[in-house]
């Protein structure tokens, strides 16, 4: 019998790619999502997961649910026996978090506390949590390793991830039956090689690469580059971009780690290489064969100049490392964008 894994927020960008990898690895994923960042496909299924089913030839169990809905979560845990939970659900826009801090704390913190309480009540004490490199705040040194101080976060989104990390650490400390792997993501981009699933931001993209690809396809006129006066090679912000498929595979490695009764473990998921905004624009121009017009505007509140990972601990302890390079990230992103000019709303 395939081990059942609950995936919260599993219809979103990273979630759907992880569900696909779970299926390929022989797990049985059960997905809950509230459609905050997903588009409905046929019936009650999110379009992203409908396509995952098509790609894998396997079925995905799905229930529409909000992690703030305690009664629904209780029913779910009564009905199913989960080996582990992969927790993606939450709000995730840095800029919006500065504007709406209470929303971020309510959904991310309260939602996670409720989930952990229900997991505990049902004896499900294995967790993979999607954290973020934003917990490091302004880097004191680069590359960032897991020992770098956390908590100096520059926005409520990052703070919410930091608080959740601390809660999970305390929980594992208090009850040795808990095992948790906290994955600090750097900047996931790209799409599945089929071009059938990818990142489909609702409204104006907050992240660089979906915006760049929408400019390339003609959905948007010009890219805004937030600041060119940073202390970096070309003055634009530097980030560690990682292929979403590599990132998704990191979650499979994390599930394996839980089997070792690992307690609380924390890993960076990044490539170890930083690229600037303008380097990413050039890489996307190369992949798409399109010119990408841009204009420089003011810096964005809460953005740091440069941020990239030291991913060596994940290699050592999880046997995981990023395999797909920048060209591949951009080619896969462009294939997704070209095949789906309107994202998941594109009619086949």
Curated annotation (Swiss-Prot):
Pathway: Carbohydrate metabolism; galactose metabolism
GO MF term (any one): UDP-glucose 4-epimerase activity
Catalytic machinery residues: 157
Enzyme Commission number(s): 5.1.3.2, 5.1.3.7
Annotated binding of NAD(+), by residue: 12-14, 33-37, 66-67, 88, 92, 161, 185
Keyword NAD recorded: yes
Protein residues bound to substrate: 132-134, 185-187, 206-208, 224-226, 239, 300-303
Superkingdom: Eukaryota
Catalytic activity annotation: UDP-alpha-D-glucose = UDP-alpha-D-galactose; UDP-N-acetyl-alpha-D-glucosamine = UDP-N-acetyl-alpha-D-galactosamine
Enzyme class: isomerase
Gene Ontology biological-process entries: galactose catabolic process via UDP-galactose, Leloir pathway
Cofactor(s), names only, from the UniProt record: NAD(+)
Entry function: Catalyzes two distinct but analogous reactions: the reversible epimerization of UDP-glucose to UDP-galactose and the reversible epimerization of UDP-N-acetylglucosamine to UDP-N-acetylgalactosamine. The reaction with UDP-Gal plays a critical role in the Leloir pathway of galactose catabolism in which galactose is converted to the glycolytic intermediate glucose 6-phosphate. It contributes to the catabolism of dietary galactose and enables the endogenous biosynthesis of both UDP-Gal and UDP-GalNAc when exogenous sources are limited.
Protein name per UniProt: UDP-glucose 4-epimerase
Taxon lineage: Eukaryota, Metazoa, Chordata, Craniata, Vertebrata
Gene name, Swiss-Prot/TrEMBL: GALE
């Amino acid at each position: 019998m395939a081990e059942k894994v609950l995936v919260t927020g599993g219809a979103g960008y990273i979630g759907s790619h992880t569900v696909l990898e779970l299926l390929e690895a022989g797990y049985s994923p059960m997905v809950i999502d509230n459609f905050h960042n997903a588009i409905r496909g046929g019936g009650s299924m999110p379009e992203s997961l409908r396509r995952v089913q098509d790609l894998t030839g396997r079925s995905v169990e799905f229930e529409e649910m909000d992690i703030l809905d305690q009664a629904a979560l209780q029913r779910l845990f009564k009905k199913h026996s989960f080996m582990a939970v992969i927790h993606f659900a939450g709000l995730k826009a840095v800029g919006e978090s500065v504007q709406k801090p209470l929303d971020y704390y309510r959904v991310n913190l309260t939602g996670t506390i409720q989930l952990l309480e229900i997991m505990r009540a049902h004896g499900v004490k294995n967790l993979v949590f999607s954290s973020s490199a934003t917990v490091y705040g302004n880097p004191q040194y680069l590359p960032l390793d897991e020992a770098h101080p956390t908590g100096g976060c520059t926005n409520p989104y990052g703070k919410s991830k930091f608080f959740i990390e601390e809660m999970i650490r305390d929980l594992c400390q208090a009850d040795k039956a808990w095992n948790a792997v906290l994955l600090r993501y750097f900047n996931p981009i790209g799409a599945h090689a089929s071009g059938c699933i990818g990142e489909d931001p609702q409204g104006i993209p907050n992240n660089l690469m979906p915006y760049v690809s929408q400019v390339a396809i003609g959905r948007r006129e010009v890219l805004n580059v937030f600041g060119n006066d940073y202390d970096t090679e070309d003055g634009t912000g530097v980030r560690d971009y990682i292929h979403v498929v590599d990132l998704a595979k990191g979650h499979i490695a994390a599930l394996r780690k839980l089997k070792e009764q690992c307690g609380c473990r924390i890993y960076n998921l990044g490539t170890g290489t930083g690229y600037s905004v303008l380097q990413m624009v050039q890489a996307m121009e190369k992949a798409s064969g399109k010119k990408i017009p841009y204009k420089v505007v003011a810096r964005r509140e809460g953005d740091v100049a440069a941020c990239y990972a030291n991913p060596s601990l994940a290699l050592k302890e999880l046997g995981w490392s990023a395999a797909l390079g920048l060209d591949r990230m951009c080619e896969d992103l462009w294939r997704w964008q070209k095949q789906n000019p309107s994202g998941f709303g594109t009619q086949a």
